[in-house]
A protein has these predicted regions:
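C-terminal regulatory/effector modules of DNA-binding transcriptional regulators
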Residues: 166-232
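Conserved amphipathic alpha-helical segments that form helical-bundle/coiled-coil interaction surfaces
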Residues: 98-161, 172-185, 190-201
Length: 232
């Protein structure tokens, strides 16, 4: 049997993934009893997992009202992507012309996984697209930068889930592929412009899109994540 800390981590990771893949949409209620029932965990364990997500600003915990998936305003969305542009441009400046063949191969594999999921219409596409940016940050070798990027990517998923098309990332597979080529070539001017334009386009596409239906029950939404946690 898993220890309490492991169970907290399992539920935290499952909920975070469901938010990242836009299965749990902004504003979705997160009742401790329903989540605990789905994962076979106590409310205390679920509450701790929700507190970790609240620390990343992915969940809002309201006194006497329970937890919900965070719902950023348009102003917060614009501020988030402005900060993310600065951070990601710093990332690509560090990596420009410094990618090893192994780095390029890893990024290409990430893009291929993204493209396959996109072609099949699977929600994993969103996660793969987001992880592309996380992998770039990881390649910089800074644990602090990596943690910050994970938080920015998670908050971005809320923006895209709230204002974009349902279960979509608005990232372009081809834009990712072109960025890797430019990084490998080492042209800093092109790389800088490409990352700025890429993130600007992601936000613009999100804010131009219509929102979708978000009315499924929490247990139904989390069922595949609970099953994956049990089998893992």
């Amino acid at each position: 049997m898993k220890q309490r800390g492991e169970r907290v981590d399992t539920i935290y990771e499952a909920l975070r993934l469901a938010i990242l893949e836009q299965v749990l949409q902004p504003g979705t209620k997160l009742p401790e009893d329903a989540i605990g029932e789905q994962f076979g965990a106590s409310r205390t364990v679920v509450r701790r997992a929700l507190e970790l997500l609240a620390g990343e600003e992915l969940v809002d915990i309201r006194p006497n009202r329970g937890a919900v998936v965070a719902k950023p305003s348009i102003e917060e969305a614009r501020d988030l992507f402005s900060v993310r542009q600065d951070v990601e441009q710093m990332v690509v400046r560090r990596l420009c012309g410094r990618l090893t063949p192994a780095d390029v191969k890893r990024l290409e594999a990430q893009i291929e996984a993204e493209e396959r999921a996109h072609h099949d219409g699977r929600p994993e596409y969103i996660r793969h697209a987001a992880e592309f940016h996380v992998v770039l940050a990881e390649m910089c070798g800074s644990p602090m930068l990596l943690r910050y990027m994970r938080q920015l990517v998670g908050r971005s998923a809320l923006v895209l889930g709230l204002y974009g098309r349902p279960r979509w990332t608005n990232c372009s597979v081809q834009e990712h592929r072109d960025l890797v080529k430019a990084l490998a070539t080492g042209d800093l001017t092109i790389v800088d412009r490409m990352m700025h334009d890429h993130l600007d386009a992601v936000l613009s596409r999100a804010l131009d899109a219509a929102s979708g239906d978000r009315e499924r029950g929490i247990r139904d939404l989390l069922a595949p994540y609970a099953e994956a946690a049990r089998s893992g």
